[in-house]
Amino acid sequence: YYFSMANLLKNKNFPWVLRAAKAKPDAMFAIAGGGSLAEEAGRLGLADLPNVVYLGYVSDGEAKSLMANCRAFLFPTLYEGFGIPPLEAVACGAKQILVSDTPCMREVYGDCAGYIDLDTNPGNVDDTTPPKADPQLLLEKYSWEKSAEKLLDILKKA
């Protein structure tokens, strides 16, 4: 299954996940998140997709399990400051992360993510740029130890 954590904020691009599910009816899509996601799907004319499961709010433990066992974690955000959920998915053992092809996501995830070109891809998980590097490399790049070292360097220079 493909897994996404969604809400109704426009920048999270929840409709892309639904269009992806419609384009790939043989795959399951699990969507966790608060708000009336199913109602929004109805408003978009995508309510009756048999391969979509709306999980509602899930606990941290449930989210970690879903991330660890998914085929890919989907993060088709329109804009984002950093985008922590895909990094969390990698830390939980997600096999692949698919993120929007935006400058921020490229800077954060580099070669470790698959990329969704939102300008040309209306919703197809198979039409993505595959990752060129092991996503586990992200855990080294953004470890607590590295973050602490960077902070210490900044404090020493201040």
Where are these regions (language model features)?
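Carbohydrate transferase catalytic cores enriched for Leloir-type hexosyltransferases
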Residues: 1-158
